[in-house]
Amino acid sequence: MYIRNIMDSDKPIYQRDVLEFVTVAVQYCAFLEGIEGKQRSEVLDIMSKLIPLLYLKGTLLPRYELLDDEEAMPADYVTEENYDIIRCNIASIMADRDDYLDVFVEDMKYSDTPVLATISENLADIYQELKNFAYVYKLGVEADMMTAVAVVKMNFEDEWGQKAANVLRAIHEVKYDEDDLREI
């Protein structure tokens, strides 16, 4: 797959902004993979810090243009089973605080009322995107790495960046809810 760099740079897959994004993406995925058994307060604390950092690093990724019609990651590492394990572990920890109302979703265009969303599904969706990206980087095939950067940036702008912003609002609400703080 051939890619044209919009910003023109030498080895763009090793630029500081890209490597910092890879680092934060790997931290996010590793935390969610080890989430089972953690307390809600710890999960909220870590996610309230990682998600804004991911968002920031996503905005700093260089934009590349794919030169052919294929716009998929070179490899899908996350299976449906992996996704469900992550989502269910988060849902179990979030329990009755998993659901939230969201107005910044595609379905809202066809509704007069907010749409029900879940913290667990949004975090798992972001996990899937970032884990697939990190896996491609781990393989070390430079052409695939370029494609992965292009795709993860494009998907940040179109999908997971909005999910990160939406779920951060819900996480903030749960983390700083006065009733929950009294229980701690």
Residue ranges, per PLM feature:
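N-terminal interaction modules that seed assembly of large macromolecular complexes
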Residues: 8-78
